[in-house]
Amino acid sequence: MKFFLATLFASAVSSIAVDRLIPGAQIIPESDTRALLRVGGHHDKYHDRRTITIRPSRNDTDDVSRDFLWGIKHANHGGRLLLKKGEKYVIGRKLDLTFLDDIEVQLDGELKFTDDVSYWQENNFYYDFQKSITFWRWGGKDIKIFGTGLLNGNGQRWYNEFAGQEILDPDNEYYRPILFLTENATRISVEGITQLNSPCWTNFFIQSKDVSFDDVYIHAFSTNKSALPKNSDGFDSLNVDGLTVTNTRVDVGDDCFSPKPNTTNIFVQNLLCNNTHGVSMGSIGQYPGVMDIIEHAYIENVTLLNGQNGARLKAWAGQDVGYGRINNITYKNIRIENTDAPVVLDQCYFDIEAAECAQYPSQVNVTNILFENISGTSSGKNGKVVADLVCSPNAVCSDIQLKNINLTSPAGSPPEIVCEGVQGDIGVECQASAD
């Protein structure tokens, strides 16, 4: 009798599991190692898990958003969603994935968003901060995304239609989606994948804790020379504690790494930035009456090539802006080549005339900053100046140190370091701004 009841129960459970499947999907238990290996649902860095597969898209218009959401829900609480190598999965509907708890997503294929601009302009997740929108949002705890695959923002149409516009223009109403966004996420990691052609910022982390990226390649390029990618930052953050980026390469045409307000405990190591606006702290201080901070950052072993800026601190100035501090930041072992402004403190951000900046200076304090072992060349665009540290008269800039700086300029020798309004000895000879 016991055997009969057990058999009946097992049969019922199996029947329920089959009934829950959608066409083209599969649920493989963690004990079935052969089946896991057959589909590629195995990774030596992570233990075997219940693995879910879904059907791939037949073409670039075959939206599998509902299948993807089904797969995420069934992989939640201890499972893994596998997106197979050689397959494409097209997402054409916004997805709220903020319910996650102990899940892995193995991205070995291509996950691609549609470029239906009219749909995404009306259907997205909107955030007031710099009028940000996204295709989807990820949240919850213990989330791992890994693999050898591609997350494709399909940005070319967005580049074409946004050409000549500016994201920070108060009249701008052409909002472009962020490729990957977390909100209220704790312990989320991304490893091994490529992120391609985000319409706007590539990654934006909001109200999250312990975010890590390792061995990721981020690239944004355009096939239209008159419509290049714009605002395609590699990494941005807002209200985040614990942000780590290691062994990563970024080629985007805007900020390589740029934590925004209230980001603390930052660690960056072994980062290569090509054709970017640099590794920036900020910008902060944008919104009237609001206090922002960036604090406790350690940036080490970074290479910056062919860019606008290298190591940069940036804060807003103007009549209606905020205040705050950038504190305890270390840039160490930084190699910079062919870069307009290798080391810069910019407290006249953004797009503000010198007269207005002088009338309404930044109120962001900059303290405990170390630039150590910085070497390479500028582009010569700013003459012989290789470091430009000009502090706002309405802010405190103190304990700023430059050690072992070996930067040269093709504009001539000796290279010049500008410092103005900085309290105390900065460790090297410097001169006042010529402006």
Curated annotation (Swiss-Prot):
One function term, GO molecular function aspect: galacturan 1,4-alpha-galacturonidase activity
Sequence ranges of the PbH1 repeats: 208-239, 240-261, 262-283, 294-315, 326-347, 366-388
Glycosylation sites: N59, N184, N224, N262, N274, N301, N328, N365, N373, N406
Keywords recorded for this protein, A-Z: Cell wall biogenesis/degradation, Disulfide bond, Glycoprotein, Glycosidase, Hydrolase, Repeat, Secreted, Signal
Subcellular location: Secreted
Annotated S-S bridges: C256-C273, C391-C397
Domain of life: Eukaryota
Catalysed reactions, as listed in the record: [(1->4)-alpha-D-galacturonosyl](n) + H2O = alpha-D-galacturonate + [(1->4)-alpha-D-galacturonosyl](n-1)
EC number: 3.2.1.67
Main location: secreted
Gene Ontology CC terms, in alphabetical order: extracellular region
Active site location: D254 (proton donor), H277
Signal peptide: 1-15
One of the protein's GO biological processes: cell wall organization
Sequence similarity: Belongs to the glycosyl hydrolase 28 family.
PANTHER family: EXOPOLYGALACTURONASE B-RELATED (PTHR31736:SF6), PTHR31736
Function: Specific in hydrolyzing the terminal glycosidic bond of polygalacturonic acid and oligogalacturonates.
Protein name listed in UniProt: Probable exopolygalacturonase B
